[in-house]
């Protein structure tokens, strides 16, 4: 596995690098900024996990996968630029990035893994790209009641909303469930206490236990 250097808080990654390996920068105490060069195709598991001073990541070019826990616990991460080459964001990839205020998910993305953006409590809006068919369990779930998420746009083509996908997003006021969704997982919208109305499309064949539990403002539910 390649070893990388950090100079003045910036990751030094050679242009010919093709992979940021498992735990490459894990728990670095000095890393503040990183640019992933265009030859890199994969950011492996825990590559930047626990880099508590990391503020900015720019991913250039050909990366297709962001591995499990890749940026988990990067508490100071404020921004990330992702290219349209990314198809998969694996579980816990950005879990606990509590300073991340906005994300632009690439149009190439097909899967958002379990807890990928869990406890990213400062994100206010999310638009899920049309290519995504599955939102993993706890993908945007919040521990506690401090979520700022107010708007989520779900695409036509989405089939699965995982267990606890938006659990405790207390400021989420509305959600439009596309007519392609077949499964709404257990506690998928539990604790979304600002949600006022929900329309379940004809395509849905399964609604899990507690899917809308503690949605205390919910006054209208339309079920086919």
Where would I find each of the regions flagged by the language model?
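Short regulatory "switch" loops immediately downstream of catalytic or recognition motifs
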Residues: 140-144
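Structural signature of tandem-repeat unit edges
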Residues: 2-19, 29-42, 52-65, 75-88, ...
